[in-house]
Curated annotation (Swiss-Prot):
Keyword Disulfide bond included in the entry's annotation: yes
Region Disordered: start-end pairs: 357-439
InterPro entries: Neur_chan_lig-bd (IPR006202), Neur_chan_lig-bd_sf (IPR036734), Neur_channel (IPR006201), Neuro-gated_channel_TM_sf (IPR036719), Neuro_actylchol_rec (IPR038050), Neurotrans-gated_channel_TM (IPR006029), Neurotransmitter_ion_chnl_CS (IPR018000), Nicotinic_acetylcholine_rcpt (IPR002394)
Alphabetized UniProt keyword annotations: Cell membrane, Disulfide bond, Glycoprotein, Ion channel, Ion transport, Ligand-gated ion channel, Membrane, Postsynaptic cell membrane, Receptor, Signal, Synapse, Transmembrane, Transmembrane helix, Transport
Compositional bias ranges of the Low complexity kind: 358-367
Protein name stated in the entry: Neuronal acetylcholine receptor subunit alpha-9-II
Protein family according to the UniProt entry: Belongs to the ligand-gated ion channel (TC 1.A.9) family. Acetylcholine receptor (TC 1.A.9.1) subfamily.
Any GO CC annotation of this UniProt entry: postsynaptic membrane
């Protein structure tokens, strides 16, 4: 072990001597090479020959892609190789020294620049050292952050792909003085750092020889095309999916009840939300003629929502047209109320979907009810004569059972011949204020069967029914006679005419309510129809827009 220590020390001393000797030779070599050398002239022995420069680009990172300003910021490693005829030596004269590294500012360098540069700073690559070999070959590796102009096509945003060019060439030397060659057929991507927004699918290179108008000599250049594909997941979840969900709210506006008063508000709110998303996309896109795919989707959705809001206003106008409007046309009754209501499952509350009846039949029955010339002793028998067996509605039956009117005791009446009377509305002008004369003396008459039932009224207007019953009770006594016997002389004709007039008013009110209900049902069926139409439109539009993505 002790014998090995002197050997190691001797070897270390030899290495130090060798390094110091090599350092002395390198210093001597640099002094000899730079003694009569000038870096201002093109280093060729024959000035008529072109100097060949080999260019190789390594793409390290895509730092940013500014679509609005159309600028690509990339981090590159640029390698240039050429031969200097004045920087050669015999390696045997310098202890076998083959390679030295010297500052690049000491030697001649080709003036290769990025033609499509978009940076305000015109500085080139860093002044790193060059590698000089004994045969005159110089290799210069320099990093550079480039800002190049790139024509951005956003027609398929966010599913777009871009092609950005990096064109390198000599700024002052033409092709007869400096010829540029490609070191590889494409850029080197072996050290590429993945970008979170863009995928790089390649970097092919092409050589071009261009004759410019200013000069008659050819100028060669090398163009590297960076193939970029956008990662669309971010935009799908932050721009496309919210728009897709919001667009499905537009058809639901037709499902809202018209009486809620929120149908138009929903459409306007959805329209404003899409406008905000549209402005966000417009701010990030360049102001060009090409409209991005997501912009087309927004515009189509906004157009659909505008149309749905306009249709909602139209349908609400139908819903609230009221009884003063014209009756529903026959074709609308047949097409909308009879057929479309069954297709779109539009039924009234409490109506059996299996045995749905049209409201037009009930309205026709009401009109017959008001035009019948034969009146029975009470309202119940009158309705049976007009095709309404069992009473007018369930509410009237419940009213009779819950509030039975007591029978007033009186002498038993024998059946006598009855007289039926009927008047029209044209006779109401002939009714004088003396039509109630003589009735006060008959307040103690026995009550008939008609007093067991409340007068008919519109089932949709309970307040009107109560008021009408009160008016009848105050005017004619404890009940309204529907018919009279021949034992009431002097009162029967006037009383019957007044009762007929009141009954006609109630019938007319029922017909008016039925007409308004028909318009409401038409509006409800149209709401359901447009709801399904717009649901289908939203779905198909989304499929078509996404299907256009490359």
């Amino acid at each position: 072990m002790r014998k090995m220590v002197p050997v190691v020390c001797f070897a270390t001393m030899l290495l130090q001597v060798a390094h110091s000797a090599q350092g002395r030779y390198a210093q001597q070599l640099l002094t000899d090479l730079m003694e009569n050398y000038s870096n201002a002239l093109r280093p060729v022995e024959d000035t008529d020959k072109a100097l060949n420069v080999t260019l190789q680009i390594t793409l390290s990172q895509i730092k940013d892609m500014d679509e609005r300003n159309q600028v690509l910021i990339a981090y590159l490693w640029i390698r240039q190789t050429w031969h200097d005829a004045y920087l050669r030596w015999n390696k045997e004269d310098y202890d076998g020294l083959e390679v030295i590294r010297i500052p690049s500012s000491l030697v001649w360098r080709p003036d290769l620049v990025l033609y499509n540069k978009a940076d305000d700073d015109f500085s080139g690559p860093l002044d790193t050292n060059v590698v000089l070999r004994y045969n005159g070959e110089i290799t210069w590796d320099a990093p550079a952050i480039t800002k190049s102009s790139c024509v951005v096509d956003v027609s398929y945003f966010p599913f777009d792909s871009q092609e950005c060019n990096l064109t390198f060439g000599s700024w002052t030397y033409n092709g007869n003085q400096v010829d540029i060659a490609m070191g590889m057929d494409s850029g080197d991507l072996s050290d590429f750092v993945e970008n979170v927004e863009w995928e790089c699918h390649g970097m092919p290179a092409t050589k071009n020889v261009i004759m410019y108008g200013c000069c008659s000599d050819p100028y060669p250049d090398i163009t590297y095309t960076v193939l970029l594909q956008r990662r669309s997941s971010f935009y799908i979840f932050n721009l496309l999916l919210p728009c897709f969900l919001i667009s499905f709210l537009a058809p639901l506006g037709f499902y809202l009840p018209a009486d809620s008063g929120e149908k138009v508000s929903l459409g306007v709110t959805v329209l404003l939300a899409l406008t905000v998303f549209q402005l966000m996309v417009a701010e990030s896109m360049p102001p060009s003629e090409s409209v991005p795919l997501i912009g087309k989707y927004y515009i189509a959705t906004m157009t659909m929502i505008t149309a749905s809001t306009a249709l909602t206003i139209f349908i609400m106008n139908i819903h609230f047209c009221g009884a003063e409007a014209k009756p529903v046309p026959h074709w609308a009754k047949v097409l909308i109320i009879d057929y479309m209501s069954k297709i779109f499952f539009v039924y009234e509350v409490g109506e059996n979907c299996a045995t749905a009846t049209s409201s037009s039949s009930s309205s026709s029955s009401s009109s017959h009810f008001g035009q019948d010339d034969v009146h029975q002793p009470n309202f119940s028998s009158h309705r049976q004569a007009n095709g309404k067996p069992g009473g007018n509605s369930g509410r009237e039956n419940q009213y009779r059972h819950k509030n039975p009117r007591p029978q007033t005791p009186g002498p038993q009446r024998h059946p006598k011949p009855r007289h039926q009377h009927h008047i029209t509305r044209d006779e109401k002008n002939h009714l004088s204020s003396s039509k109630y004369e003589g009735f006060e003396s008959n307040r103690n008459l026995p009550l008939g069967d008609c007093c067991k039932e409340a007068p008919p009224c519109c089932p949709e207007d309970e307040k009107t029914a109560v008021v009408a019953a009160a008016v009848a009770s105050v005017t004619f006594g404890p009940c309204v006679f529907c018919s009279h016997g021949s034992s009431l002389p002097g009162v029967d004709s006037k009383l019957v005419r007044n009762v007929e007039y009141i009954a006609n008013c109630f019938r007319e009110q029922r017909a008016t309510c039925a007409k308004g209900a028909e318009w409401k049902r038409v509006a409800k069926v149209m709401d359901r129809f447009f709801m399904w139409i717009f649901f289908i439109m939203v779905f198909l539009m989304s499929i078509l827009i996404i299907g256009k993505a490359p």
